[in-house]
Structures are given as structure tokens and as C-alpha cells.
């Protein structure tokens, strides 16, 4: 593979990762389809995907840095809450409660989860995750009990963490599981999305570092330019995607995302079966 060809592949996959990582559409499903079509598969490809995920995570840190610092008691400038909202109550405890279920199950069943990473499982989870998004829109309370992040209770945070366990099934979409769970627990669509992003930082960072440690032997000096292009591309595109997504969900429901998941599931079937 020529240098220019590999850099082009890195840029394409970086765009795919950045666009889909935090949307409820399954970045895994998109990555396996695009990677297969580009002929970029195997151990190096898996390590590459781990590295560019760090770019997406960094985008969340940049977007929510004030809120992230606030979780540990460090505040900059004006308070985060707007007029009429409750005083800042989202704490590190909410994040920890949201992490515990998936961390425990993820560590216990890590090898089993990795064995589920194949096109047929991803196809099924795309469909199931789409159905969950539809259920969340149809069954959510008419008036959210937690319209803002700072209105969330510890119980809601923990239950969102339980829903996040669904994302251990490859292809389900971590954001899709957590946002749907939040809405079903009475958290507004916007606040559930914000909490999903905040929860992604420690969850994805931990999982990515663990995977990178296990995949380190497949990384060579010759791969660094390709990995760097993918990382930077994923970071920039994820920044744009997060900003756009948060504006979009103020105006539309998640039904279009659910339908899109069904289309991607059909694409997986066509490409691999």
C-alpha cells in the first residue's frame, strides 16, 4: 500500500469515526463496512481504529472542558446553569454511577465481548438499537423529570449506566443505548445526549487504553503518519458532528436515526452476506 493511498484511507476512516462515534448510529457498523470496502482489515486496522477513537474522545474533552472540570470542583467564569435552572448538581458521583455497570461487565466478559465482533452480530444490534430508539421516543414521559443535566438524580445516572451495558454488544452504539435509557428514565433528549458525551470520556478512554495496550505490538514507526492523519481527522470531524448533533436534536426526534440504523443493517447484509 503506497503512502498516499494509506493516508487517504486514514482520512476516510477518520471522517467515518468522527461522524458516527457519538451519534446513535453505531460507529462499529460503519467502520466494518467502510474498512471492508477499502480492503483495510486485520490487526493493523483494529489498532488504527483504537487510536483514532482517541481523537473522537479528545473532541468531547474540548467541547465540554468546563463541565468536566466542574465535575471535580474546578469552575471557570460564570456558573454553568442558566436562569431558572436548578443549581449545579451534576457531580462526579453521577458519572461513576453511570460507569459502574458497564465497567464491571466489560472487565468480566472482555474476551467474550471481543468474540462477538463480527458482521452478523453487528447487523442484529443495529436493528435492536434502532428499535430501542423508537421505543424511547414513544415511551418517554411527556414532560421530562430532568430537563437539564443538573436535574438528574443518582438513580437516573445508574439506570443510564445499566442501559450502557447494551453497548457491550458490538454494534449497538454506546450513545444510542445511553441516550435511549436516559429518555426512558425521564431525562430530556438534550440532557441525555450531554450526559452520554460526558460519560463517554472515562468509558471510552479506559476501553481504548486497554485495547491499545493489548494491540501495541501491531503498531510500527511506519504506521505513525497514517495513524496521525486518522487521529486528527477524527478529532476535527467529531467536533463538528457533536456541535451539529446537539443543535439538531432540539428540532427533531431520534426516529430518523433509527431508520438510518435499519438502512445500515441492510448494507451490512448486502456487503457481507
From Swiss-Prot:
UniProt entry keywords in alphabetical sequence: Antibiotic resistance, Cell inner membrane, Cell membrane, Cell shape, Cell wall biogenesis/degradation, Hydrolase, Membrane, Peptidoglycan synthesis, Transmembrane, Transmembrane helix
GO molecular function annotation: undecaprenyl-diphosphatase activity
**Top-level taxonomic group:** Bacteria
Localisation per UniProt entry: Cell inner membrane
Q: What class of enzyme is it?
A: hydrolase
Which stretches are annotated as coiled coil? none
- The EC designation for this entry is 3.6.1.27
Provide the membrane topology annotation.
Answer: Multi-pass membrane protein
Can you list the GO cellular component terms from the UniProt entry? plasma membrane
Q: Report the record's Gene Ontology biological process terms.
A: cell wall organization; peptidoglycan biosynthetic process; regulation of cell shape; response to antibiotic
Q: Name one Pfam family in it.
A: BacA
- The record lists the membrane-crossing segments as 6-26, 45-65, 90-110, 116-136, 190-210, 222-242, 252-272
Reactions catalysed, semicolon-separated, are:
di-trans,octa-cis-undecaprenyl diphosphate + H2O = di-trans,octa-cis-undecaprenyl phosphate + phosphate + H(+)
Q: Give the main localization category.
A: membrane
Q: Identify the PANTHER family for this entry.
A: UNDECAPRENYL-DIPHOSPHATASE
Other observations noted: Bacitracin is thought to be involved in the inhibition of peptidoglycan synthesis by sequestering undecaprenyl diphosphate, thereby reducing the pool of lipid carrier available.
Which family is this sequence assigned to? Belongs to the UppP family.
Q: What does this protein do?
A: Catalyzes the dephosphorylation of undecaprenyl diphosphate (UPP). Confers resistance to bacitracin.
Q: What is this protein called?
A: Undecaprenyl-diphosphatase
Q: Which gene encodes it?
A: uppP
Amino acid at each position: 500500500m503506497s503512502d498516499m493511498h494509506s493516508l487517504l484511507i486514514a482520512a476516510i476512516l477518520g471522517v467515518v469515526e468522527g461522524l458516527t462515534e457519538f451519534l446513535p448510529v453505531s460507529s462499529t457498523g460503519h467502520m466494518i463496512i467502510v474498512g471492508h470496502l477499502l480492503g483495510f482489515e486485520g490487526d493493523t486496522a483494529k489498532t488504527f481504529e483504537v487510536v483514532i477513537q482517541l481523537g473522537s474522545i479528545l473532541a468531547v474533552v474540548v467541547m465540554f472542558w468546563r463541565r468536566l472540570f466542574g465535575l471535580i470542583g474546578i469552575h471557570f467564569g460564570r456558573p454553568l446553569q442558566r436562569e431558572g435552572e436548578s443549581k449545579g448538581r451534576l457531580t462526579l458521583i453521577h458519572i461513576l454511577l453511570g460507569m459502574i455497570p458497564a465497567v464491571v461487565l466489560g472487565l468480566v466478559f472482555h474476551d467474550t465481548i471481543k468474540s462477538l465482533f463480527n458482521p452478523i452480530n453487528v447487523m442484529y444490534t443495529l436493528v435492536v438499537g434502532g428499535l430501542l430508539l423508537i421505543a424511547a421516543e414513544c415511551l418517554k414521559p411527556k414532560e421530562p423529570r430532568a430537563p437539564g443535566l443538573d436535574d438528574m438524580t443518582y438513580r437516573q445516572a445508574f439506570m443510564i449506566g445499566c442501559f450502557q451495558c447494551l453497548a457491550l454488544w458490538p454494534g449497538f452504539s454506546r450513545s444510542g443505548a445511553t441516550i435511549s435509557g436516559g429518555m426512558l428514565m425521564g431525562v430530556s433528549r438534550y440532557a441525555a445526549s450531554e450526559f452520554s458525551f460526558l460519560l463517554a470520556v472515562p468509558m471510552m478512554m479506559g476501553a481504548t487504553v486497554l485495547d491499545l495496550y493489548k494491540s501495541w505490538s501491531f503498531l510500527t514507526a511506519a504506521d505513525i503518519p497514517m495513524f496521525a492523519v486518522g487521529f486528527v481527522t477524527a478529532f476535527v470531524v467529531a467536533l463538528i458532528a457533536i456541535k451539529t448533533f446537539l443543535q439538531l436534536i432540539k428540532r427533531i426526534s431520534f426516529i430518523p436515526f433509527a431508520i438510518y440504523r435499519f438502512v445500515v443493517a441492510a448494507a451490512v447484509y448486502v456487503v457481507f452476506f
